[in-house]
Curated annotation (Swiss-Prot):
NCBIfam families: rplT_bact (TIGR01032). Belongs to the bacterial ribosomal protein bL20 family. Component of the mitochondrial ribosome large subunit (39S) which comprises a 16S rRNA and about 50 distinct proteins. Interacts with OXA1L. This is Large ribosomal subunit protein bL20m. One of its GO terms (molecular function) is structural constituent of ribosome. GO terms for biological process: mitochondrial translation; translation. The keyword Ribosomal protein applies. GO terms for cellular component: mitochondrial inner membrane; mitochondrial large ribosomal subunit; mitochondrial ribosome; mitochondrion. It comes from the Eukaryota. Its main location: mitochondrion. It is found in: Mitochondrion. Keywords: Mitochondrion, Ribonucleoprotein, Ribosomal protein, Transit peptide. The lineage of its organism: Eukaryota, Metazoa, Chordata, Craniata, Vertebrata.
């Protein structure tokens, strides 16, 4: 059996404590000050870094979603639509693109995004026309205004 380094040769002879310390110091290698040399300080710093790393993974998702919404808002306002109306009308048109894809389209393929905005705007206009109707009351419905003769 050939050992290429003294560390590997020592591993068979020393206790596990040495390797636990080395594992912590390996994670603390890039820290400044005594935190990368003193085990006691390194344990605290590494634990704190791991906790922050875990919390940051959730924050990253939240921040990216906010960024995507801001970018879609800006892109849809260029075409005369507000963000909620744009998203709702795309859903009504059964366009199932998520926010990340919509942002990529807005940045890298503006003509495609323009056609999606036109589709959403057309759907919005159809909704307004259906809500207004033709202005006549249907037969058999009493209105609130009662006319006396």
């Amino acid at each position: 059996m050939v050992f290429l380094t003294t560390r590997l040769w020592l591993r068979n002879r020393l206790t596990d404590r040495y390797w636990r310390v080395q594992e912590v110091l390996k994670h603390a290698q890039h820290f400044r000050g005594r935190k990368n040399r003193c085990y006691r300080l390194a344990v605290r710093a590494v634990t704190r870094a791991f906790v922050k790393c875990t919390k940051a993974r959730r924050l990253k998702k939240r921040n990216l979603r906010t960024l995507w919404i801001n970018r879609i808002t800006a892109a849809s306002q260029e075409h005369g639509l507000k963000y909620p109306a744009f998203i709702v009308n795309l859903i009504k048109c059964q366009v199932e693109l998520n926010r990340k894809v919509l942002v990529d389209l807005a940045i890298y393929e503006p003509k495609t995004f323009k056609s999606l905005a036109a589709l959403a705007k057309r759907r919005q206009q159809e909704g307004f026309a259906a809500a207004l109707g033709d202005g006549k009351e249907p037969e058999g419905i009493f209105s609130r205004v009662v006319q006396y003769h």
